[in-house]
Amino acid sequence: MKTKKMNLNNSVQEKKGVQKFAEKFKNYVKAHYSVILLMTIGFLAASAINFFNVATGKTIASFNLEEFEVGQVADRTIQANKSIPADEMNPVFIEEGEKIIRKGFPISEDDYAKLKKMSESPMYIDIRSFANSELFLLLLMTLWFMLFAFVPFGRKILIREIIFQVVCFLVVYGMTAFGSKTQIFSSPFSIVIIIPAALFVLIEAILYGQLSAVFFSFMLSLGVFNATFFGSFNITPSCVVPFLFTLASCVSASMIVRKIERRIDMVVVSIVLALIDTMMIVILSVIFNEVFNRLPIVLIGVAFNGFISGILALGFLTPVEFMLNTASVFRLMDLSDLNNPLMKKML
């Protein structure tokens, strides 16, 4: 009898515990529904970029086209499960059920042309690659939400700041994903030229402080990693180099800009950031033993990226302040200066 009462009491306590947790969870969702909705919209937008990224990627049945070459003895058999008609760009016809390459046989030029045809066709989408990329993106969004929901910033995180970060993340993610598919920016060292991550981190640091900018730097860097990772299980320099460069450049930008007080100081920030970006490319090329003839062009490109990021940050700062209804340290310094023309008129 006592045992039954104890079991009944335990079950009642468990139900109360579950109800309390459900109530707390419900209240938390109500309090942060706008942030959760915004994160969900950002995730769906990034997923759309992911889909087009994977659909236009050079992967065949979860294997990368770069793993094959003419004359190589195939280590697996790849069979076409869909027919692909010939076109002007690639006049090769692929029949459904046709074995493109056979394990143990060398790959001919015709075989490689068919592999390339399959990789470029939107009819062949690497589902595993897309799922891997989506899982990484989901974990990234969860980490993002946890950081900005539970880390003590000493101030209230406004929804306007989250909107700004999500928009900037999508711009960086999209430019990295699609820029790496162009021939001129296909190298992991050249793709960093067009990644505007440092620009957004500078604006974030000026408007919302260094801590937010550092966290945002990690989010952007992980986004760049996923955009160049293609959902593969092989971590190569093609995704590591852009990730490390973006992380170093963004964290450096957030550290450099923290003590400036005048707008003219942004020119110095631009020069210093250009030098840091150039040094990072040289260091990464040494670490990964990269030797290529276009290194001087890449160095000029990343230096320009760093310099123009600081200049554009200064130019975009005023309209961003207006749109986000916030004030930067420059605006506060102007208002505290009694010699400022605006203050003279008010006085």
Each model region followed by its residue ranges:
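Membrane-embedded alpha-helical signal segments
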Residues: M1-F164, L295, F316-E321, L347
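Juxtamembrane helix-loop transition segments at the membrane interface in multi-pass membrane proteins
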Residues: K2-V18, K181-I195, S217-F225, V257, ...
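Juxtamembrane loop-helix boundary motifs flanking transmembrane segments in multi-pass membrane proteins
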Residues: G17, M123, I195, L199, ...
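Hydrophobic alpha-helical transmembrane segments
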Residues: S83-D87, I107-L115, F185-V192, V214, ...
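Glycine- and small hydrophobic-enriched segments that form the cores of compact globular domains
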Residues: K114-K117, S121-S129, M175-S180, S190, ...
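Alpha-helical transmembrane segments of polytopic membrane proteins
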Residues: S129-L138, P188-I195, S238-T246, I271, ...
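Short helix-perturbing small/polar motifs within transmembrane alpha-helices
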Residues: L140-R160, F164, F169-I184, V201-V291, ...
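Acidic/His-rich, divalent-metal-binding segments that scaffold phosphate/diphosphate chemistry
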Residues: S217-M219, M266-L347
